[in-house]
């Protein structure tokens, strides 16, 4: 669920998804195209790919179980879809934390029209 993903991002990075990640680069936020701009954008690209494999799941709106304890995100039990969505979100939030040192404010509201290089495939 998008609100749960936001909480994971905040837990890992201490930044709110909006405005820091919702419009970042070529892949963060709704949709994505061309090539990721940097490590942060690549986290979003991989997250999009992860969701893309879950074609039978309601990736943006399914509510799943998880906990935030002792510096770790742990996904809980649920349906196969809910567990997989949680894992996609957990991995992406942890990736965003690892990419904090290279986060660029210039990509924060990056116009998708400037994403020109050839697309990558998952």
Swiss-Prot record:
Expressed by the venom gland. The keyword Transferase does not apply. Its main location: secreted. It comes from the Eukaryota. One of its GO terms (molecular function) is phospholipid binding. Its cofactor is Ca(2+). One of its GO terms (biological process) is defense response to bacterium. It holds the Pfam family Phospholip_A2_1. Disulfide bonds join 26-115, 28-44, 43-95, 49-122, 50-88, 57-81, 75-86. It is found in: Secreted. Its EC number is 3.1.1.4. Activated by heparin. Inhibited by its chaperone crotapotin. It is an enzyme of class 3 (hydrolase). It catalyses: a 1,2-diacyl-sn-glycero-3-phosphocholine + H2O = a 1-acyl-sn-glycero-3-phosphocholine + a fatty acid + H(+). The active site is at residues 47, 89. Optimum pH is 8.5. GO terms for cellular component: extracellular region. InterPro entries: PLipase_A2, PLipase_A2_Asp_AS, PLipase_A2_dom, PLipase_A2_dom_sf, PLipase_A2_His_AS. Binds 1 Ca(2+) ion. Optimum temperature is 18 degrees Celsius. Keywords: Antibiotic, Antimicrobial, Calcium, Disulfide bond, Hydrolase, Lipid degradation, Lipid metabolism, Metal-binding, Neurotoxin, Secreted, Toxin. Ca(2+) binds at residues 27, 29, 31, 48. Snake venom phospholipase A2 (PLA2) that shows moderate neurotoxic activity in isolated mouse phrenic nerve diaphragm but shows high neurotoxic activity in a chick biventer cervis preparation. Also shows a high bactericidal effect against both Gram-negative and Gram-positive bacteria. PLA2 catalyzes the calcium-dependent hydrolysis of the 2-acyl groups in 3-sn-phosphoglycerides. Belongs to the phospholipase A2 family. Group II subfamily. D49 sub-subfamily. When this protein is associated with crotapotin (F5 or F7), it forms the crotoxin protein. This is Basic phospholipase A2 F15. The lineage of its organism: Eukaryota, Metazoa, Chordata, Craniata, Vertebrata.
């Amino acid at each position: 669920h998008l609100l749960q993903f936001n909480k994971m991002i905040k837990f890992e990075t201490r930044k709110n998804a909006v405005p820091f990640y919702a419009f970042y680069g070529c892949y963060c936020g709704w949709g994505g195209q061309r090539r990721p701009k940097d490590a942060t954008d690549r986290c979003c690209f991989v997250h999009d790919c992860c969701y893309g494999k879950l074609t039978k799941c309601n990736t943006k709106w399914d509510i799943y179980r998880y906990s935030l304890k002792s510096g770790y995100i742990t996904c809980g039990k649920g349906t196969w879809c809910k567990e997989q969505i949680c894992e996609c979100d957990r991995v992406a939030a942890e990736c965003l934390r690892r990419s904090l040192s290279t986060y660029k404010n210039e990509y924060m509201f990056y116009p998708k029209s400037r994403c020109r290089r050839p697309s990558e495939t998952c």
